[in-house]
């Protein structure tokens, strides 16, 4: 019964009820308005002996000192257990301007035990084009904790080698945007669907007073993912136009019948439109249990024999009772789960049954294994 309730609960959460309108901004994004990934390499200093002595960390440390006019003899090997080499990455949201700040994540790339208590020195964050878009620096917040004893025993909570700096990067260069380059905007659906694209275009035309029959069209579906919308050229008018447009509500097309299985976690999500063709199923399990026991044999107290330890293997074979159940045409989600649950099938068994039904062509829906 727990399996039935769990699957029905998850399905009710993720499946949008039929007839529920949603805003355009929740289902689509404007083409060209996107975040950009930034990455950099730097040094964290001030660690309480939890740093590292990796060759690349030492080389980076020498380079940093050289930039400050300090030269170390090549024969000297500095002890830098309070320094760690790190990778720094951040997301640069659209339209942010120089002088604004963004959060950064700092991750150890060497053998550092922890970044707690460290400070990131000035690190250039570059984009895919190799240009510097932001500079990161500051003290980190590390949620993880680690401690190690002299005998090698240690305890680690969460991840002490990853930290975060809120507003830790200062933007130095804005990313060019194509928001004003054309006489139109392109809306990209988060989940491409031809029916939804047409409904979206029809909704925009209707709400903005377009008349496709007379050749006056504002929104045109391009493909399953994109809808092109005519927009004002003036900056102020375009912003106001998009602010109004993204709050229009419409009813997207029903999602295709789909079953998603995560074989690693045992999670199964079944869409409400999944149906079954007539099919009969039997599913049973053969369980083999092997256990090892050690038996000690003591010699006679007056004898000259030795104590002998022998291994004893116990093999137990259990064949579960199998039951066959039959599906009539058009069986729904509720009936499918209830029937499988009544025969005592675990989530792993349900996965095997669904895969077998798909192979047999009796499953009217797409089976996705992730």
UniProtKB/Swiss-Prot annotation:
This protein's superkingdom? Bacteria
Q: What is its main location?
A: periplasm
Task: Provide the protein's localization.
Answer: Periplasm; Bacterial flagellum basal body
Family statement: Belongs to the FlgI family.
Q: What protein name does the entry list?
A: Flagellar P-ring protein
Mind giving the lineage of the organism this protein is from? Bacteria, Pseudomonadati, Pseudomonadota, Gammaproteobacteria, Alteromonadales
Query: Could you tell me the gene encoding this protein?
Result: flgI
An example GO biological process term is:
bacterial-type flagellum-dependent cell motility
GO MF terms listed in the record are:
structural molecule activity
